[in-house]
C-alpha cells in the first residue's frame, strides 16, 4: 500500500545502513523499475543500480551506507550476482557466481552477516565482500547436498570463517 511505502521511506532515511534489493531500492527512491529492463549490457545495468543506491543515500537524513543486494546480471557470458555498496568512500561492487536456484533466507542471512561485521569494526565494503563469500560457499555446499530451496542453506559450518575474519579485523585495528 502507499501508506506502507511512505512509512518504509521515512524509516529507511533514518538508518545507518540499508540493504534493499533492486526492486525495493527503486520503490524507496521513486525510480522507475521498468528502466532496469532497458539495459543490454551488464556495465550499464550495474551503473543504473549504483545510481539508484546513490539516490537513496542522498535522500537519507544523515550519513548512510546503501547496499543493493542480489543484483543479477544474466546478460553476461557467465552470469553473476552483484552486491553494490554506495558509501562516503564511493561505489564498491562485489560479485559472485549466480547459481541456477534461489534459496529461502539468503537475503536475511546476507544482512545479518553485514550487520555483524559492521558491529565488529569492518567497513561496509569489507563486510559486503565477506558476506558474499560466506553465501557463495554456503549455497555451493547446499547445492551439492541437494537441499530443497525452501529449507534454506547450509551455512553453519562456515560460521567459523566469519568468526576468524572478524577476529583478524579486530587485531588489525
Predicted regions and their residues:
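Conserved phosphate/ATP/ADP-binding segment of small-molecule kinases
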Residues: 1-91
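Short pre-catalytic strand/loop immediately N-terminal to key active-site residues, enriched for Gly-Thr
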Residues: 91-104
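Short Gly/Pro-enriched loop/turn and capping motifs at secondary-structure junctions
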Residues: 73, 100, 135
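Charged C-terminal helix
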Residues: 125-173
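Short, small-residue alpha-helix embedded
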Residues: 101-124
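Phosphate-handling active-site elements
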Residues: 91-92, 117-131
Amino acid at each position: 500500500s502507499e501508506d506502507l511505502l511512505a512509512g518504509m521511506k521515512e524509516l529507511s532515511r533514518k538508518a545507518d545502513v540499508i540493504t534493499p534489493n533492486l526492486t525495493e531500492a527503486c520503490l524507496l527512491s521513486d525510480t522507475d523499475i521498468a528502466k532496469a529492463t532497458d539495459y543490454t549490457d551488464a556495465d550499464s545495468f550495474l551503473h543504473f543500480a549504483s545510481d539508484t543506491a546513490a539516490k537513496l543515500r542522498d535522500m537519507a537524513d544523515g550519513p548512510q551506507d546503501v547496499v543493493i543486494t542480489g543484483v543479477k546480471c544474466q546478460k553476461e557470458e557467465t552470469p553473476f550476482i552483484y552486491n553494490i555498496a554506495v558509501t562516503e568512500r564511493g561505489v564498491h561492487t562485489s560479485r559472485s557466481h549466480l547459481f541456477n536456484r534461489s534459496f529461502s533466507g539468503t537475503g536475511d542471512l546476507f544482512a545479518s552477516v553485514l550487520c555483524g561485521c559492521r558491529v565488529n569494526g569492518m567497513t561496509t565494503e569489507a563486510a559486503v565482500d565477506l558476506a558474499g563469500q560466506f553465501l557463495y560457499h554456503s549455497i555451493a555446499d547446499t547445492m551439492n547436498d541437494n537441499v530443497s530451496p525452501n529449507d534454506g542453506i547450509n551455512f553453519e559450518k562456515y560460521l567459523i570463517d566469519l568468526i576468524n575474519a572478524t577476529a583478524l579485523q579486530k587485531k588489525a585495528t
